[in-house]
Structures are given as structure tokens and as C-alpha cells.
């Protein structure tokens, strides 16, 4: 059987958000790795939601380790924006709360230097019999605040069902 990855019909805004992140990661990796490979964007299901995913891989040179690579990439536009320095300064000035566990990376780290990492976009912290859900939404010039809010609520339902 031939398995094909398909990008289901996604709104243009969602595809642009994915491309911002892909372009950023590829441009950063191209400065420190060789043979960067990028898949076509495709759709994956997580809980009840569909997401756009792009696989990106490369081989680190002798002078680059995983810690340096993460420092180079984090935060990605998925959680900060572009251009990164301007977006980060805006967030620091206007957001008004500690993002705590909202973002970071997670995945497999192994001694064979073949790691498989993901940007953490949603998570939950349970502390003192309280659950705190962390999620966000992609804000672009084409964003509709009502739709973004509904998207965040829908994203939270996946974790809320666990509780």
C-alpha cells in the first residue's frame, strides 16, 4: 500500500501561519546544518482537531549540539511571531502575564543524536487540585478575534476532556 500525506483544505490564514514557521526554521537550520529536508505540508489529527504539519530534518555539523540548535530556534514564530525580536518585545510589553508552560519543545532526545522534537503549543499544569490549560492562537493581519477565541476554546477542549 502506498501511504500519501495529504493537506486537507485549510483556510489560507492557517497555511500562511504554517509557512511562516517552516520558513523560519529552515532559514535558521540552513545556517548551521547540512542537507536540510522539508516535507510538503500535510494534515494530522490530534484529538478532535486537524492540524497542519511539516517535517523538517537536517544533519548537525560537529560544532553544533542539540542545546545550541534549540537556542537558535526557540521561540519559533508559532509562539512568538515574526520578526522575532520585534514580536517578542511586543509580547513582553503587552501580554501582561507569565506564559509559564505555554511553550517550549518536547519529544525524544537520544544519545545517538537522532532527536525528534516538536514545538509545544498546548499543555496543562496540575497543581494544588487546580488545572491550568495553556494554549494560544496564531494572530496575523487577517485574524478575526472572535474566530481566534473560538479556536482557542476548541483547542482547550481536548485537554479539558481528560479532566
What is the role of each PLM region?
Residues 4-92:
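Contiguous alpha-helical scaffold segments within structured protein domains
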Residues 56-163:
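Conserved hydrophobic core element of enzyme catalytic domains
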Amino acid at each position: 500500500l502506498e501511504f500519501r500525506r495529504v493537506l486537507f483544505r485549510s483556510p489560507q490564514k492557517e497555511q500562511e501561519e504554517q509557512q511562516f514557521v517552516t520558513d523560519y526554521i529552515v532559514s535558521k537550520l540552513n545556517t548551521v546544518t547540512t542537507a536540510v529536508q522539508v516535507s510538503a505540508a500535510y494534515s494530522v489529527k490530534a484529538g478532535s482537531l486537524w492540524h497542519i504539519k511539516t517535517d523538517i530534518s537536517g544533519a548537525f555539523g560537529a560544532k553544533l549540539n542539540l542545546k545550541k540548535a534549540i537556542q537558535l530556534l526557540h521561540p519559533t514564530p508559532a509562539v512568538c511571531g515574526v520578526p522575532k525580536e520585534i514580536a517578542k518585545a511586543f509580547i513582553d510589553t503587552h501580554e501582561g502575564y507569565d506564559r509559564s508552560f505555554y511553550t517550549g519543545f518536547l519529544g525524544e532526545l537520544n544519545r545517538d543524536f537522532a532527536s525528534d522534537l516538536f514545538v509545544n503549543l498546548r499543555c496543562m499544569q496540575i497543581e494544588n487540585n487546580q488545572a491550568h490549560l495553556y494554549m494560544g492562537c496564531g494572530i496575523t493581519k487577517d485574524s478575526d478575534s472572535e474566530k481566534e477565541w473560538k479556536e482557542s476554546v476548541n483547542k482547550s477542549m481536548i485537554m479539558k476532556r481528560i479532566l
